[in-house]
Amino acid sequence: MEISERLTQEFKINPTYTANIIKLIDDGNTIPFIARYRKEMHGNLDDQILREFADRLTYLRNLDKRKEEVRSSITEQGKMTEEIETALAEANTLTEVEDIYRPYKQKKKTRATVALAKGLEPLADIVQAQTVASGTAEDLAKPYVNEEKGVNSVKEALDGAKDIIAERISDNAELRKKLRKIFLKQAEISTKLVEDKENAKTYEMYKDYSEPVSEIKSHRVLAINRGEAEECLKVKVEFDKAFGIRICEASVVKPGSVTTYLVEEAAADGYERLIFPSMEREIRAYLTDMASEQAIKMFEVNLRPLLMQPPLKNKIVLGYDPAYRTGCKLAVVNQQGTVLYKTCLLYTSPSPRDSTSS
């Protein structure tokens, strides 16, 4: 779906207005200018809706740009498939795009990349397939012991295979999407007070504090962030570890194989070492973004009455905004700032150049 079509659907406006707003923004016009002086081009939308429209337009353009970058990178690696192409086309957020790209992203040195460099990927494939029902996992690993490559024992070979599988599990886009939703519903934010810090008393209420991620208020998120920045609070995301591991196991474990236990160990390691820290960072970033956005909205609400207060104490005021094309706008407000009357006067003349008669 084209960006303009999506914006038309999301904001429930006429497609012509959508095209007009996009052009006005691209031409460098500010939101206040568009809201006030180009009303006929967007159906008299207020500045708040127009600002949301502009933000969404920017996000969708960044989303399309990132999709193309990811598509090009995966294609250059010769790993593009119809499944990946479809997933990219259906991705609605930057987070989903990054989840898709994660397995193909050039990584820094990790335990899995070290194991891959040692030639242990075929062993990881065998272990993860879990199709061998007889013998032992050690028997499968013996051919991969190679001192020249740094694989000095069967245990090292199996450990390397598990590292590869753990990273694969961590890179599973569908699994991460599922866990992210569950974390947002069930995870909690917990804090501990660092009592020997100078400003510790300021954050006394967060001494032994916890609250569900789904319920925490924006002002508490910002307060916790300040306390952490001042090193007065230790902050963690809490989630049932056993439950998280079970979800990971369910995505990859097949019972009845001599390698099943290794995949279970890899799933547990992948969750604890890779997935949970990543989810914790994502949850914290999400809460901070939501809290900051809410704080801005609250600031707007508090600022509005200050800006709209009567300009002259105990006086009735006539406001006059002259304009030729759109007419002269007049409004009368009473001593309390209530609008008593408003109108628009259109002055015309036989010739646009005849400014005197106008």
Regions found by a protein language model. Give the residues of each.
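Generic start-of-chain signal for non-secretory N-termini
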Residues: 1-19, 26
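Short alpha-helical scaffolding segments that buttress acidic/His motifs in well-ordered protein cores
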Residues: 21-22, 101
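Short alpha-helical segment immediately N-terminal to, or the first helix within
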Residues: 23-24, 90
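Feature marking long nucleic-acid-engaging regions of large polymerase/nuclease enzymes
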Residues: 30-44
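Short, small/acidic-rich helices and loops at N termini and domain boundaries
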Residues: 44, 52, 56-58
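Duplex nucleic acid-engaging cores and interfaces of nucleic-acid transaction enzymes
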Residues: 49-51, 63, 68-69, 73, ...
